[in-house]
Amino acid sequence: MGAGQAGYPGYVFEWQSRLAHNLYVSMVMTSQNFKVIATGLEFPEGPIAMKDGSILLVEIKRGTLTRVLPTGEQEIVAELGGGPNGIAIGPGGQCYVCNNGGFDWHTDTAGNRPTLQPASYSGGRIEVVDLDTGSVEVLYTEVNGVSLSGPNDIVFDAQGGFYFSDLGKVRRHDQDRGRVLYAKADGSFIKTLAAPVEMPNGVGLSPDESILYVAETPTARLWAFDLIEPGRVQKQPWPSPHGGRFILGSSGYQRFDSLAVEENGQVCVATLVNGGISIVSPEVGSVEHISFPDPYTTNICFGGDGLRTAYITLSQSGQLIEVPWPRAGLALNYLNK
């Protein structure tokens, strides 16, 4: 073990050996490195650092869009029902929501954990919330006559369109195949970009918006889709299963969740089981891992001065935490760009 490292003050490092073509570095975070902003959240996800200092997020189990103030006080912005999962600010300042339709839940002393499609499943959908009034509009429920089953994460491009993942739903004896889609913010156009994708979760754009990154949950793989233009992918030939370029896969059992991109182009992937944030350098295929005390570390966003503060959801324990970050996050369209 070694303490400190250039750019990572206060972190404790444990170096691991080179595995195949990837260099895995484990960084164990000590308690003084993060601040708990809010507790008692019902499986928080999808944080957005707003300009007023508040954090907008969803509570999947509670079915709400929630605002967390810097004091930790929580306000319900909208009652959405189902399973609001990922959010993004779009043109006009409205909040676009990926709603997966709901989960069954397992609750124990560690907190909440989503499981199967529930009897109360309300269908997958993209919703739009007016942040001033809390009014909710359903924008999309299907693509080419096929229902959305479990929309998960979302990112806007500079042209006003958005990419989102449809992870699908898992039932006791079968499950849906996932896909990645592109749609316009006004509800006029939606298309499938890649399918089948194995439970696609986090999505994010490279700084120049020429690459769409997609994280698969059960495989713990990160894929890159090269974009010819907004909503159009230059697909890789077989044996790529869906046209994406393989960037990185886990060397052990863990699962990938949502992601955010740094200003320098590195991809920060929330990692389950081995709870933490895996920081991937796409050009060299290396990864660093920062651990947090929750196996359901599900999402990360950037805010604060120079976008050098990370806000991370520890979902099983119901916490939102704040972490000083060694590099700047990427500014997002319609939010802070």
Predicted stretch roles:
Residues 2-9:
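Extreme N-terminal basic, low-complexity initiation segments
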Residues 25-337:
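Sequence-structural signature of mature extracellular/luminal beta-sheet repeat domains
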